[in-house]
Amino acid sequence: MLKKVLIKGPVLSRSGYGEQARFALRALQSRPDLFDIYIVNIPWGRTGQISSVDEEANVIHETLLKTQTYVHQKGQFDISLQVTVPNEFEKIAPINIGYTAAIETTKVSPQWIAKANETVDRIIVVSDHSKKVFEQTKYDVKDQNGNEHKNWGLQVPVETVNYPVRVFEPEEVNIDFRTSKNFRHRRS
C-alpha cells in the first residue's frame, strides 16, 4: 500500500527553501511504487514564485489541487515532510519529519529544540555542521513544576542530506574584440 506523504513547504518559492522543497518532491517522485504525494505550499517571506511553465511546475499545481480535494474529503496522511524552520514544525501525521537548512552558527535556540522535540520524529538538515550543532546544543532548564534538567537538548535523530548542485555547461560566446570604438585611448 502506498504511503500518503504530505510535503509542506514553500514549493513554489524562488528561494533556498523552495529549492529544498522541490528537491524533496523530486526524490519522493522517484519512488511512485512507495509514495502517494500531496503538497501544501507555504509562503516564504517576500520571495518571488517560480514562473516556469514546465513539467515540474505542472505536476506541482496538479498535486496542489489533488491535496485540496483530499483534505476537503477529510483525508489523512501517513507521513508529513515539513520543509521550513523548526519553530514552524507541526504534528500533522503519525510520522512527522522536519527538513530544515537550520542555522550556520554555534547554538540552536531553545525554542527550536522544544518545538522539534514536541512535534517531529526526525530532522533532516542540509549540512553536517547543522547536524552537529543540533546534536551538541544543550541547556540547563526548569520544567513547569520547577524541576531542573541539566544538559537538556534535542531528543529526536538528525540526519544530513546534502543539497544537489546543478551542473551547467558554459555556452560558447563569440565576441569580436577588434573595435575602433571601445577602449580607445583619448588625448586631452
Spans of model-derived segments:
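Short secondary-structure boundary/capping segments
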Residues: R22-A24, D54-E56, I97-G98, K138-D143, ...
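Residues at the starts of beta-strands that form the adenosine-phosphate
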Residues: K4, L34-D36, I95, R122, ...
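Extended catalytic core of nucleotide-activated donor transferases of GT-like folds
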Residues: L6-K8, R46-V133
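Residues that mark the start of a beta-strand
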Residues: K4, R187-S188
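N-terminal subdomain of nucleotide-sugar transferases
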Residues: M1-G45
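Structural signal for conserved beta-strand scaffold positions within catalytic alpha/beta enzyme cores
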Residues: I39, Q82, G98, E159-N162
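Helix-enriched interaction subdomains in cytosolic or periplasmic regions
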Residues: I39-E56, E148-W152
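Donor nucleotide-sugar binding/catalytic pocket of nucleotide-sugar-dependent glycosyltransferases
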Residues: D121-R186
